[in-house]
C-alpha cells in the first residue's frame, strides 16, 4: 500500500501521507522507520532538532539493504534549525544532517521557523534547541532572504531536490515570493480542526505551494509537553462531530481527521508505533467525506495554536 502523491512546483512528486519523526524515541526510531517502510510509507519527515536522524537513517539503510525499497523510492524530508540561518552556516549543517541520515540528498529541506537564533556550534550543543548552551535564547541577525539564498544554493549543488518553509505567515510568504529565485515547494504548518488557517492554506495553494499539515490530531501531541492550551482542549478523537462521522464511514477518528486534510489536497505526517494504526493512517484516501462533513469539521476551528514558542515559556513571538 503506497499513498498517492502531490506534484510539487519543483517537478517532483511528494507522497500525500508520510511518517513524522517528531518525538520518536531514539531507542525505537530505527525499527519504527523500518517497519513503516515495510507497511508502505515512503515519506519520512525529520529535523535536526528532533535528535533522531542517525537512527532514522539506520532504519532506511536496513530497508534498502534488504531490497524492500531503493533510495529513489523514498522521499526524505529534513529541516534547517533556527541557529543555522546565517548564510554560511546553511550548507555545513545540511551536509551534517545528510551524513547523519546516510544519504547524499534530501528530497525536501525546509526552513523550520522564520526566526534566526545566534549560531551555536554543533560541537557545543547538538541536537540544537531554542536555548544556547547557557540556557539563554539569543536572536540572530540573519534575514530570511539571506537564509533563503543559501537554501537555493543547496538545490544548485544537488544537496536538496526541493526546498520549503514551515511556520510562515501569509505576510512572510508573500515577501519571500518577491525575491525567491527558487520558489518554496511546500509550506508546513500546524493544521487541525481547532486551527484550520484556511486563508493561509488557500493563499499557498493558489501560489502553487503544496501544504503539509503537522499535529493533525490537535492537542494530543502536546499533552506530554504540558502545554496548557492542549490540556484545556477537548480531545479531537472524542469530539462528537468526529466520532459520528467516523462511525458513519466505518473508520477511526484518526482516519477521519487525516482524510479531512488529504481530501482538501493537504499532506499529512502522522506517526505511530502500533502496526495496525500504521496501516490505518496510510489508508486515508480510500474513502471520501461529504461536503457537509468537511464543513462540520472545519467549523470546529477555534484559532487554537499549540506549537507556539510562548506556550513553552520562550520569549519569542512568531505568530
UniProtKB/Swiss-Prot annotation:
Q: Which organism is it from?
A: Emericella nidulans (strain FGSC A4 / ATCC 38163 / CBS 112.46 / NRRL 194 / M139) (Aspergillus nidulans)
The chain's coiled-coil residues are none
The active site consists of 50
Broadest EC class assigned to this enzyme: oxidoreductase
Keyword Protease carried by entry? no
Q: The organism sits in which domain of life?
A: Eukaryota
Q: Show which residues form the site (Lowers pKa of active site Tyr).
A: 79
Protein name per its UniProtKB record: Probable NAD(P)H-dependent D-xylose reductase xyl1
Transmembrane segment boundaries: none
Q: What is its EC number?
A: 1.1.1.307
Gene Ontology CC: cytosol; extracellular region
Catalyses which reaction(s): xylitol + NAD(+) = D-xylose + NADH + H(+); xylitol + NADP(+) = D-xylose + NADPH + H(+)
One Gene Ontology biological process? D-xylose catabolic process
Q: Which residues bind NAD(+)?
A: 166-167, 215-224, 271-281
Q: Which InterPro entries match?
A: AKR, AKR2D, Aldo/ket_reductase_CS, NADP_OxRdtase_dom, NADP_OxRdtase_dom_sf
Q: Which key words are in the record?
A: Carbohydrate metabolism, NAD, NADP, Oxidoreductase, Xylose metabolism
Q: Which family does it belong to?
A: Belongs to the aldo/keto reductase family.
Tell me the route in metabolism or biology where this protein functions: Carbohydrate metabolism; D-xylose degradation
Where along the chain is substrate bound? 112
Determine if Transcription regulation is one of this entry's keywords: no
UniProt GO MF annotations = aldose reductase (NADPH) activity; D-xylose reductase (NADPH) activity
Q: Any idea what job this protein has? A: Catalyzes the initial reaction in the xylose utilization pathway by reducing D-xylose into xylitol. Xylose is a major component of hemicelluloses such as xylan. Most fungi utilize D-xylose via three enzymatic reactions, xylose reductase (XR), xylitol dehydrogenase (XDH), and xylulokinase, to form xylulose 5-phosphate, which enters pentose phosphate pathway.
Q: Which Pfam families match?
A: Aldo_ket_red
